[in-house]
Amino acid sequence: MPKDQPTAIHRQDYRPPDYRIETVDLEFDLEPTATRVKARLAIKAAYDGGGVRPLVLHGDALELLSVALDGRVLGAGDYVLGDKSLTIAAPPASFTLDIETRINPAANTQLSGLYVSNNVFCTQCEAEGFRRITYFLDRPDVMAVYRTTIRADRQRYPVLLSNGNLVEQRELEGGRHMAVWHDPFPKPSYLFALVAGDLACNEDHFKTRSGRDVTLRIFVEHGKVERTGYAMDCLKRSMRWDEERFGLEYDLDLFNIVAVSDFNMGAMENKSLNVFNDRYILADPQTATDADYAGIETVVSHEYFHNWTGDRITCRDWFQLSLKEGLTVFRDHEFSSDQRSRPVTRIQNVRALRARQFPEDGGPLAHPVRPDSYIEINNFYTATVYEKGAEVIGMMQTVLGRDGFRKGMDLYVQRHDGQAVTCDDFAAAMADANGVDLGQFKLWYSQAGTPELTIEGKYDARDGSYALTVAQRCPPTPGQPDKKPMHIPLAVGLLDAQGRDIRLQLDGEDAAAAQEGRVLAVTAPQQTFRFRNVPKPKALSVNRGFSAPVNITLKQSGAERAFLMGHDSDPFARWEAGQQFATDLMLKRVEEIQRGAVSAYDPAFAEAIGHILRDEKLETAFAAEAIALPGADYLAERMAVIDVEAIHAAREALRATIAKTLRLDLERVFAANRSDAPFSPDAQSAGRRALRNAVLGYRAALAAEDPDVAPHLLHLYSAADNMTDRMAALRLLVDVAGAERQAALDDFYDRYRDDPLVVDKWLSLQAVSALPDTLDRVKALLGHPAFAMEKPNKVRALIGAFTASNPLRYHAADGSGYAFHAERTLALDPINPQVAARLLAPLGRWQRFDGDRQAKMKAGLQRILAAPKLSPDVYEIASKSLG
């Protein structure tokens, strides 16, 4: 390997730190271009044995001003200053180290460490940002108690915040002031936070179950406080839910949230001072959609839940990232399920998993939930670590039962509060609390790839038995050519001709053990489960509730799938039957398009959709999901060689078929779900809007042949009294060429030009348009005043939306989308390598396309890798993508 290429870090090389930092006293004198940081560290040796080991502190982009050991100022010969380190060769066993550095937050476009966003000082220290503030043992297994003093100009920065409790605040000379914060709970450096600025505040209170009165504050830019009410409500509901569901109570008297407009992530769980991308805090009916409200609920709860699963108990090393993230995503999924509709929440989570994580598991960037190596840890904040990690936790709950899982959580907290631990420690707590062996189950942490199940059911009328045979395999992934059989919890059911669940009695069980639906433990390469005393079944229902994140091959006719769509007692399986029915039809149409001979769609599918539309007992949010077709990304994953044009044509043809066949049903449902009531973000109201707009989507499928569609969409856009309905109409209109499209886009920008979050929606809508000139429009928008490469939200809204969410135009046969992607990656890398790397994944899927596209995608990756001074972030993704 050439010496200028970054090297990998391996999990197997973990060693405990040689030194521990017990207390940290920080002093900040804030100035945008020249902030001085003083750090006093109380350090003790943590190694056994003879000899003296060097102290090596991490540092990045720091100007070192002074170092003192036990009060003695060190000369240049007393330490070694490296490009990214500060080394003291032979320190004593216990000592105090004083370090003074100077940093330039205003120039920190990476948004890692201390930076300035809209005149607000802000930090982001996860994963390795603290080393950009001062020299430190910047690793998660070094936990210390922090005391932070902040000094700043009183007029420009009246609000001074850090972790823990405010213990002192006073005026200083020269128009400055100071605040001192103390966090009594030991924490790793990645959880340190500081915010200073001129901010408005929404204050509320929460009383814990033990009677503690907690002050809750959300800080935002002036003029935006009125848009924080929903986030505050979510926070209070999250605190109560965690007490009731897991017995976990908040532990300080103050909980602060700050929303900023420039942020690499969605939010950050710093102890008692959460910092949020403002898109996950600000909402009102005129600027936020139902999806935005749901996103706020998810992210606010997620970051609060980290107080115990992430802050009080943290990761030993970054390979254990899913210990906190997978567990906390599972917890926020459970919270949303309890607050809204559990079936609909499950469906939406599975849609997201299949769109983001399944392709990751099937591509060159596949990695286990607990990775074995990385070059840049920022690249492993992935769908696998988060979403698949959450599925692993969910399967634990399925295997152990809800009560058993709670016992495991209680033991985990009891054993490890205040510690930095591993995924194995969590699994051990679950196993020990329930007296079970999770050895095979833990392969979910170490094996990459999406397991594939082949399922076959056979009924024997002679003895009333049903044999269910399940074969499993996990395909090869980079570095893991051979896989062991997994422990897969598979929820199944059998339905009779009336759609009722048949009680299932496994061979060898007493009749009293029979249940309607069973969770089978699939543990071998192939197993057969035999059920006794089974009346003739009509249909087999598998992976109910999406009990395991697997792909399934199961031969079922259209009639069987239609029956399940109408009768399965498990809502997820009912939805899934429709998804698989539609997928089979559209993939068949793709093959026909490629052959040049197209037949009509099976009318049974449209009729099954009609039954859903006519079923007034169904929850509207579920009906909206049930009539929605699988996305192009899901269809692509089912193809050996992806054909984006044929997929698009097949989807549009099926949409049009449904629109024509069910026109009267669609019109009736659209009218029935209209409401004159004031906007409310509650689940029931959101469900009505979701169903009405899903129905509208089918009407729009006829735009090419019905000249009334575009004017109708423009009318609905103009008449909308909330952002959900306005965006729904505009999203459909951007795919229809004509004057109405441009009129609506111009009006939208004129209405919301002063609201950056809403303008982000305007950018994204244009980036995902199916029209042929979309890339030209995206390029033009790069020069629009609304866009800035320095702002991650803008980059994600325009460039990210085009490359990740517009497969038809991104994968244009001429390669223009790939060339644009490579060009923008190289432009963004020097500004913000973390964001540049995260947007690169679509280019790495080159192996799934035809030879011509493969060559063009590889050329884009090679162009990136050939660039000088490439960041480790982008280098890792690009090099692994090429293989």
Descriptions of predicted regions:
Residues I103-Q110, P475-P476, F546-I552:
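Short acidic/polar inter-strand loop motif in beta-rich domains
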Residues M1-R36, Y115-Q124, R131, F136, ...:
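N-terminal, polar/Ser/Thr-rich
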Residues W181, R209-R462, A467-V470:
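Hydrophobic alpha-helical and helix-loop surface patches within well-folded domains
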Residues A46-S117, D138, G174-G175, A521-K538:
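A surface-exposed beta-strand-loop module
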Residues R40-L62, Y135-D138, A144-D153, D424, ...:
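Surface-exposed beta-strand/loop patches in extracellular or lumenal glycoproteins
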Residues E63-D70, F192, D437-Q440, T450-V542, ...:
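Beta-strand-rich binding/interaction modules
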Residues E100-E203, Y230, D570-R574:
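Extended, low-hydrophobicity, Ser/Thr/Pro/Gly-biased non-transmembrane segments
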